[in-house]
Swiss-Prot record:
It comes from Mus musculus (Mouse). This is RNA ligase 1. Keywords: ATP-binding, Ligase, Nucleotide-binding, RNA repair. InterPro entries: RLIG1 (IPR041211). The keyword Ligase applies.
Amino acid sequence: MKRLGSVQRKMPCVFVTEVKAEPSAKREHQPFKVLATETLSEKALDADVYNAVATEKVDGTCCYVTNYKGQPYLWARLDRKPNKQADKRFKKFLHSKESAKEFHWNTEEDFKPVPECWIPAKEIEKQNGKPVPDENGHIPGWVPVEKGSKQYCWHSSVVNYEFGIALVLRHHPDDPGVLEISAVPLSELLEQTLELIGTSINGNPYGLGSKKSPLHFLTPHGAFQVRNLPTLKHNDLLSWFEDCREGQIEGIVWHCGDGCLIKVHRHHLGLCWPLPDTYMNSKPVIINMNLNLNNYDCAFDNQSLFNQFSKIDKQKFERLKDIILDV
């Protein structure tokens, strides 16, 4: 499958959305819901969503691979957010106006500091060479994940910079009905965005690992193509999510020909997530580390995921939930 678009900005919904004054099922303590109407959005139509590649929206945290210190590095998402005074002004403005775009930001003074190594996301809007905050008042960006990072320990667990590899979950190249966990050179993932999923991410919707033996992987965006999708109509998509085995996913992301990404989340359709039994957990999974350790001058840490998976290389499991590593 060819490389698809990367997530460098907030994705719009495929439908026009409306806000309802009901408690959110997605965010605790949020007193409103954002629901899809039956009208396709102008952005979706302009991007020719009818001819886009539909893929599974995977529930994790967004990451990015690009160079740092002269080699490919994994980067964690870090949005630059307004300081207390600016946030107060922004929220007051939103109550009196309809569009966040009319608000005037001072990017030098209105935002909390970020590490020097922080970089803004690629596709965000810029004015006079400076990044413009999105409709939430945030500037999406990235920070490199250093080896042994405590703040980003789960990110760090899926990469090894000495070996230059990442632990990746995707379809088996010879059998789309089988998942594969493999060690992939970071150089092959350059300029891609991926989703970090696992035990300690977003409440672990896929039931991976355990507190005693946490388990995490990177999944490239667009890795799981959705086939046999119904027509782009609200009720047809609703029925597909509710009734089809393939519909037991968080949502759909359409990768459009112009690089635009369009999404729909189960919550947009008033449906629940997470689910007790996900489509991702309905497929067998095989371990293919394919590492010739004789080619390296260093060895894996005994506790690392790479070492643990090397011990069960070539084994096959009925589903992801069944993988339990020795501690």
